[in-house]
Amino acid sequence: MKLNKEKFLKSELGGNLQECVTAWDLWLTELRKFNIDAVGQKYRETRKAADWCQAQWEVFQTVMRQFYNIEYHFSRTDEYFGVCTEDETDWLFKVEREV
């Protein structure tokens, strides 16, 4: 099956994938605020949310591989985050951060 990115991202599945990846990026950003040895309730809740998003992403990743034969990855830097191929030549979507 050929992937029409624009159409896919407007679908329920595509919208949910974007929502999941955006939330994962947010939770990972929140995790950076904690010390390496953090153990409090707020840390546990944040870690759990980030882990949940990662698990959901892995399901989306499998769907993309199974239906479209494309191996997408989550990519994030200080400048952007998004979903792309390993070599970052093909982006499903990319969000530039405001600096």
Kindly label every feature range from the protein language model.
Residues 2-28:
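Short, charge/polar-rich alpha-helical segments
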Residues 20-95:
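Acidic, low-complexity, intrinsically disordered interaction modules
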